Every structure is written in C-alpha cells, then in structure tokens.
Amino acid sequence: MLLVVSTALCVVLLDGLLWLAHPLPSGQSARWIWKHDIAGVKQEVVFEKYHDLRGLSWTANSSLQKPPGTFRILIVGASTTESSQQEPKDAWWGLLEKRLQQQPELAGKAVQILAFGQGGFEVSDINTWLKHELHELNPDLLITLVGVNDVAFPEHSDSDLPGIYRLRGFLRKVSQIYRHASAIKLKWEVARGLAVKWITARDLKDLAGKLRALPLSEPASRNPDPLPRFVAGLHSIISLARNNGVPVLLLGQPVLWKDQVTPDEDSVRWFRHYEGSEASRASGAWMYHEMQRFNDAQRKAAAETGSCFLNLDEVIPKSLEVYYDDCHYTDAGSVEVAEAVFPAMFECLHRK
C-alpha cells in the first residue's frame, strides 16, 4: 500500500513539474516524407497529421480551437478521407480548401478544412470520434464520406473505442506525463514508418490475390444485414451535429464497382464482404448494387432530417484513371471528387 501511495505522489509531483517547466500542448503533430509506387499518385508524399487519437490532417497548421474569423469545415470518413497515399494539398479535401479560399464571398475570412479519416472506420466509429471532438473543433459545416467499410467489413468491432476515447481525452487534458509520452511515441512511430498505415503496389496485388482465393457468395439478402446499423449511425451523427448547431452534407460513397467491370478493373479489386464472420468474394456488379443500397439509405436519411446529400457514385467516373483499387482515388480522382463536392457544399451552406 505504501508503495502505491509513494508511486502516486511521485507521478503527481512529476506531472506538476512538467506543467511548470516544460508544458506541451494537447494534441501532438508530425510531418514526414514517404515514397511509394502506387500508380496514379505522386511518388513522394509529404504528410502531416495530428496524433493522440485526433487523427486530423490539414494543409496548414492551426490550433484545434477555431481562430476568430475562420470559416472551418470538418470532413470525416475512413481511408478515402485520410488519403494517406497523397499529400494533403493533393487530397480531394485539400483541393476543395484551395477552391474555397479563392471565393469572393469568403473574402476576409480564413478558410480551413480539417479532415479526419482512419482506414477501416465505419459510421459507428466516426460517430464515437465526433462525440469527443465535434464540440471542441466547432466547424461551420460537417461533411461525411462513409459507407464502403459498412458494406464490406461490418464485422469490425468498435466496442472498445468509447472507453479508450474517454480515457485518452481525460489524460490529454490533465496530464503532462501523458502528453510527453504521446510525443515520444509519435516520434518513434514516424521514425519506424508506423504513424500511418502505408500501402504499396505489391500490398495491393497481394490483397487482390487473397480476394480471388475466397469462395464466391452473392446472397440476395445478407444475414445479419449491416444496413440498419449503418442507418442508425448516420442518424446519430446528424443528431449530434444538429445539437451543436452544425449543418451536415452527406456524400454517397463513390466506388469503382459497376455492372460491367473490365478485366483490368477487376484485377485491382480486393474488398471482400462478410456474412457473419466468414469472408466471401463477390462480383463488381454485386458490390456495386450493395453500395447503391447504402447510398440510397444516405439519401433517405438526408431527406428525413433536412440535411444535404450528394451521391458521388452517380457523378464520379468509374475508371482506373480515377481509382487505383475498389474505392481509393488517384490524384486525378481527387480532382473529380473536389469538383463535384464544391457546388454541393455551397448549395448546402446557402440552404442553412
């Protein structure tokens, strides 16, 4: 018992000394260079990202608290928002920010887009993240790009996220020891190339090969059906945004999948789908119609709640010039997405 009390007192004293002598801000960031070989994107990426479970990316550094006179948009999603194979300025949201900064009606304001995405995240994961970050970030508009992981990987478990987020959120507010440990961990991850889940052309080829080895399954209905959980997550995000006075633009997920997939297009596919815990392979046509079902659910949720909606899958070309796999964008693809989102975003802001 004495050892426990002594250790606790030492921790408190050390934390107090760090607050006085060497305080670190909450939410560390890092910048590093990565080289890769994926077709359609630049071969050298300068990447910058917040650490400490915030996972935010940006084109120019900024405090988490919105500066006065700033027009801030928060974009949330999974890997197609994280855009880890691109520099922030080449990602679709970076291009969108550049367009916004050139608009006369926003003259005199600093325009900023913060993007949060993490590979594999589903709507429920994003909802959990927003519950802990939306109020502090205080955006003028929330844009979501979700759905493909809910279609393909609904067995992902996020049951531990709320507890982890609450604990880390508390520690980063009160503990300098935690902040210093986070900074050291981030530097170590950057040095070892672990700060982002990078992927190479060989990785993509291996993933595509693993898909071909799976049994073919194209059920008329899925059991369990992941759609109700997806819809519940959407409504939770919209309600959370409304409670914080933030309008929402839902983006339907664009994908390479379509009714007639060419052999070259089929060769880059690696997304599987799950029935229970069993992974299966399906044609591009089956995956396309499943994605349509989820995008239609987003359209319905937007109509029911008075939110804005744009189905990107109806306007983005389905070709290897735009995608380097099932759903991730080349540099040319990011241009297509930014050009499509720009007018829809302005229309949404004018509605609100």
Ranges and model annotations:
Residues P68, R72-I75, T80-T200:
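Conserved SGNH/GDSL esterase-like catalytic core that processes O-acyl groups on lipids
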Residues S79-E87, A115-F116, A220-L227, G284-Y288, ...:
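Second-shell loop/turn segments in exported
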Residues L2-L17:
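Hydrophobic membrane-insertion alpha-helices, especially the h-region
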Residues L2, F230, K300, T305-C308, ...:
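Histidine-centered active-site loop/cap adjacent to the catalytic His
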Residues N149-R299, T305, P317-L320:
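Serine-dependent acyl-ester chemistry module
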Residues W93, E97, N127-K131, L227, ...:
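Extracytoplasmic/secreted envelope proteins and their assembly/folding machinery
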Residues H22-L106, K318-L320:
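Membrane/wall-proximal cationic-aromatic binding patches
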